[in-house]
Amino acid sequence: MTNKLYEKIKNFIKANYKFIIFYIVFILLFTVSFDYEIYTPGGLSNLDDRIIMDDEYPSKGTFNLTYVNAKKGTLPMILLSYIIPSWDLVSIDDSRIENEDYDEILKRGKIDLTSVNSNAIVAAFNEANLDYKVDKNDLTVYYVFDSSHTNLKVGDIITKVDNVSVNNADEFRNIINTKKSGDTVEFTIIRNNKTMKKTGEIYESDGSLLVGIYLTNVMEVSTDKNIKFKYSGNESGSSGGLMSALEIYNNITKHDITKGLTIAGTGTISSTGEVGEIAGVKYKLAGAVKNKADVFIAPTNNYKEALSEKEKNNYDIKIIEAKTFKQVLESLEDL
């Protein structure tokens, strides 16, 4: 029985080996990806569907997030990127620090998203002269360098160093500066909602005492509007901060600043309203034009590129420069 089955398999392979080889090669071509992504023009995401709150004021127009379509770097996609003018081949290393893996990149992006959403609330409520409450401002591990000797991970919230409470990077630094190279320090942290102890060995680099981590404060705020953000599990990053702040502001003030227009844009935002640059503005602008947006808002450091793309491609869209949140509101008022 076994011999007959073996003979059948062998004969089938002999008769169909060319097809089998072709099939395997075909599957590999479209499934095996390299350390590249292909950036292509993206689209719009209406923030009415992303930010939910109580007692919203009505709006005739819309504020929209813009995004870049990133395709996996399979061989056919890589080859097409050399043929299609609006497609660009980008190394994944461009968004990677040292040797971090995809999960670490995503965790950093989630930290950015949480932080910028809170910044958007604060910037909007400050401009509208409305109250909000800072519930948390966690000292969070944003990155762990390869040179470190610690069991801390990205996303850990540090509450104490050697049993001394810390609230920000300066307080953390002051404690580390009392140590010497080779000392081991103990961290009290929160990871996955559980309090635990971790350690790190101090080392010296360029005259500074280091643990080998990058820290950031992540704020969470609450308001009487019960604001909720709706994002999928693989969405992350801070580039939607400005547009989120505009959406929130428009929902909490009587005057409709959209004026019935489809307004798209991009840019990070700080809690004090400063707008920061982003990557991929030409793909975001192309997506906005493709989806018939009336206005595109670009951060100052991306503004010239956006204007250049508009002129080069003869785009029919109004482009606004974004320096600060307050200035963007004034520019929208002047439309």
Q: Where would I find each of the regions flagged by the language model?
A:
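Hydrophobic membrane-insertion alpha-helices, especially the h-region
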Residues: N16-D35
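C-terminal, low-ordered peptide segments at domain boundaries
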Residues: N192-E247
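Second-shell loop/turn segments in exported
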Residues: Y102-S115, Y143-V144, K160-D162, K228-S238, ...
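Terminal peptide-recognition signature
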Residues: F125, G155-I158, D162, F187, ...
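Glycine- and Gly-Pro-enriched alpha-helical subdomains that act as flexible
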Residues: N251, S271-K304
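PDZ/PDZ-like domain segments forming the peptide/carboxylate-binding groove
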Residues: S115, I121-A169, E274-A279, N291, ...
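N-terminal Lys/Arg-rich, disordered targeting/topogenic segments
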Residues: M1-K14
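PDZ-domain C-terminal substructure recognizer with occasional recognition of PDZ-binding tails
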Residues: N174-L215, K312-Q327, S331-D334
